[in-house]
Amino acid sequence: MNHFKKIAGVLEAHGLDAVLLTCEANRFYASGFHSSGTDGAAIVTRNRSYYFTDSRYTEAAARYVQGAEIRQTDREHPYSALINEVIEKEHITRMGYEDEYMTAADFHRFSEKLHCELVPATELLWTLRAVKDQAELDCMIQAQRIAEKALADILGKIRPGVTEKEIAALLLYKMLHYGAEDKSFDPIVVSGANGSLPHGVPSEKPIQAGEFVTMDFGCKFGGYCSDMTRTVAVGHVTEEMETVYNTVLKAQLAGIAAAKAGVTGAAVDGAARQVIADAGYGPYFGHSFGHSVGVEIHENPNATPSNSKPLPAGAVISAEPGIYLPGKLGVRIEDVIVITEQGCQNITLASKELLIL
């Protein structure tokens, strides 16, 4: 799976002869091939595509990159020289670059050495990546199923005395065991008072009876991410715990019900936020309702209070409201939804009923 043709198809409308891809995520989106960090570059022109890498990846690139000419860089043939060869061959005068990713040092170096005008093109790439095709969705759904199987396997291990770190390690192992290529991000496992830390780091803290345990995790399949959060209780719950949990779930369902192509990200966020505010917990929901997911765990567009743009059909967005009472507890519930013309499709199947282990 690659998107060379999809990228090439929008260049003329944006007044570009080509686009230069240097960041790992955009290189993978275009080519379907992983090379780590800065070890690669690609140029997509209106008619042809080129993939540049060094000797460590040349053989693999030749095997897996379809629809692009492979060029090998080395000490005698640096990236700038190879890129200039393509610029001359393809008569490129205006080339897009990733202004939100490229470092100032790299931009300065390319600006000095490349024989064409460099034009910001991150927004163009974000717009393309926002709308997933069926092959991309299939990978994301498979990643989600793997994560759900991992969760089902480890629920029986969550009990008093087990540490947050141990639960995080089990999730990672199980996702790899069931076929994940990698984790989407470092898993978040927080319990009790640590639950009020939305992005808390799993610690040596033992889980205790009467606490919530929040697990935010995901994996990659086919280069695409999954993302989900479930909060479970251990032993028993108080009335307050149950109220907070049910409020978060009601807010999530309200946001999902509001999600539809053409609706703004702010409107989706607002539907969920209003539920939490009406329950008296407004100050304790500080982050946004959701972010897009794809090749990267955080993409665009987002369901945030500041996003006044309509969501496109085909966008894949997390739905993850939360309530965090400092020093006391936290609850977050997260699914991933696909925006459609009719509403949205929830690709997360794991139960959201309050589970008391």
Describe each model-derived feature in a short phrase.
Residues 1-357:
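Active-site neighborhoods and metal-handling regions in enzymes and metal-associated proteins
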